[in-house]
Regions:
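Short beta-strand segments
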Residues: 18-22, 82, 97
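Short, contiguous acidic and Ser/Thr-rich linear segments
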Residues: 20-32
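Ferredoxin-type iron-sulfur electron-transfer modules in oxidoreductases and energy-metabolism complexes
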Residues: 31-50, 97-223
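Long, hydrophobic/aromatic-enriched structural stretches that serve as scaffold segments
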Residues: 49-50, 65, 69
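Short, structured protein-protein interaction patches enriched in aromatics and acidic/basic residues
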Residues: 53-65
């Protein structure tokens, strides 16, 4: 498979960026999207050119590190699929693929496609935890939790913090991320003692980090 790539290149947060055209050939349909970028970077290195910087770690859809806007869609065309789990069989030979970083004031570009998402860390540090000692695993069954409540908390805890919700939102709001983290802990008995304080502090941290406000558009949910 031969592909044409239009990739955002930017040296640093304060430098001016631009799209640069590349092409890659002999890409397997079974290759992942990041493996395709690896192939491009190997080619660039062999030409003594600077490889494209992009975030990645586990490549298993778990860690939340991968963060690419592919053809205008955070994580690409496949729903409920992270960039690292996207495979090239979803593209056609000869396609032109536009690749850019998350776009948000709170997520400044570090280099090329890599962005600084430490604003999420600040939200978590403000209240995304339970300060009371909750005991060891042996003690967990001492507090019965209805299955419906446990399921709700687990659904919220499934957020991997990738930031696609922010990238999709026209306001660059982090309310889906913040709401998930608040809901996760506030749903459980161990977290209820601090739920009001937690909610206020985490929303304040979100606002202070420079995220926009939520206007109930729903773009965040569609890419989560």
């Amino acid at each position: 498979m031969k592909l044409n790539l239009k990739i955002w290149r930017q040296e640093s947060k304060n430098s001016k960026g631009e799209y640069v055209d590349y092409s890659v050939d002999n890409i397997s349909e079974e290759a992942s999207f990041l493996e395709m970028l690896d192939t491009l970077n190997e080619s660039l290195v062999s030409e003594n050119s600077v490889p494209v910087a992009f975030d990645h770690d586990c490549r298993e859809g778990i860690c939340g590190m991968c963060s690419l806007v592919i053809n205008g869609e955070p994580h690409g065309p496949e729903k409920a699929t992270t960039t690292c789990q996207l495979h090239m069989r979803h593209f056609k030979d000869g396609d032109t693929i536009t690749i850019e970083p998350w776009r948000a004031n709170a997520f400044p570009v570090i280099k090329d496609l890599a962005v600084d998402r430490s604003a999420f860390d600040k939200i978590m540090q403000s209240g995304g935890f339970v300060t009371a000692r909750t005991g060891s695993a042996v003690d967990a069954n001492e507090i019965p939790i209805p299955k419906e409540v446990a399921d709700k908390a687990m659904d919220a805890a499934a957020c991997i913090g990738c930031g696609a919700c922010v990238a999709a939102c026209p306001n660059a709001s982090a309310m889906l991320f913040t709401g998930a983290k608040v809901s996760h802990l506030n749903s459980l008995p161990q977290g209820k003692a601090e739920k009001e304080r937690r909610s206020v502090l985490m929303v304040q941290a979100m606002d202070q980090a420079g995220f926009g406000g939520c206007t109930n558009i729903g773009a965040c949910e569609s890419v989560c």
